[in-house]
Amino acid sequence: MKLPYFLLGLAGLAAASPMGLAERQLSDGNELRDGSCKPIIFIFARASTEPGLLGISTGPAVCNDLKMAKAGQVLCQGVGPAYTADLMSNALPDNTSPAAISESESLFKLAASKCPNSQILAGGYSQGTAVMDDSIKQLPDDVKDKIKGVVLFGYTRNAQEGGQIGNFPKDKVKIYCAMGDLVCDGTLIVTAAHFTYVMNTGEASQWLESKLSDTTTSSLTGSSSSDTSSSTSTGDSSSESSSAAGLGGLSGLTGLGSSTSGGFPSLASLF
């Protein structure tokens, strides 16, 4: 039965931002490849089934926030097209495909080589968090040093990596794991909580801005002075709790088992 994978796909389709689709798509998400350098480069990996390179929820929201705060200084790049954001890749050992990991690595290296004076910010949602984790931890140190901050929404490798990105400074990572989002516990069980992260994008954008050096000057209104709000955190890499209010009708979405051997279940166990 393939219904559980359909439910996992809802994570990408149901996490709609309150703002309109057209308003959220101010960037085509291919600005690093197609454009000239700017002081800040934001690289993002979308959730499973989300269209485009940035997706239609958390990615465009953070991109737009950063562009509003740092007018004319930000370019946004989504991971794709090699990263297809397909459902089946969630069950692979790295919780995403080798092609996606390789493409993400290449984008970070491109940012560092094409724009050596730029600061890099990054993020991911759902399967996109695995893309970020698996690619960033493999980067050479000189490229890692250029990455100032990473935000992860619904971190699918949160349990496997101990609430951080492997081989990367914890104080450069902000993890949002909503209360009741079981993918953060190392499962493929999708609940309503996994759809709530658009509520965290404003704070996430402010946190990313706070990690930048003083080479850029404008500031997001109401920037947070702390890495956490109403959440429990471990060090600087924190797990945020967010409410599933308004999504109670989806709260019964379950159906996938717990992970084994550090990854998600084998494909055979999902049908």
UniProtKB/Swiss-Prot annotation:
Reactions catalysed according to its record: cutin + H2O = cutin monomers
GO molecular function annotations of the record: cutinase activity
Disulfide bonds: C37-C115, C63-C76, C177-C184
Record's protein name: Probable cutinase 2
Annotated active site: S126 (nucleophile), D181, H194 (proton donor/acceptor)
Disordered: region residues: 216-245
Signal peptide stretch: 1-16
One cellular-component annotation, GO: extracellular region
EC numbers for this chain: 3.1.1.74
Family, similarity comment: Belongs to the cutinase family.
Main location: secreted
Site positions (Transition state stabilizer): S48, Q127
PANTHER family, per the entry: CUTINASE 1-RELATED (PTHR48250:SF3), CUTINASE 2-RELATED (PTHR48250)
Pfam families recorded: Cutinase (PF01083)
Biological source species: Aspergillus niger (strain ATCC MYA-4892 / CBS 513.88 / FGSC A1513)
Functional note: Catalyzes the hydrolysis of complex carboxylic polyesters found in the cell wall of plants. Degrades cutin, a macromolecule that forms the structure of the plant cuticle.
GO biological process: carbohydrate catabolic process
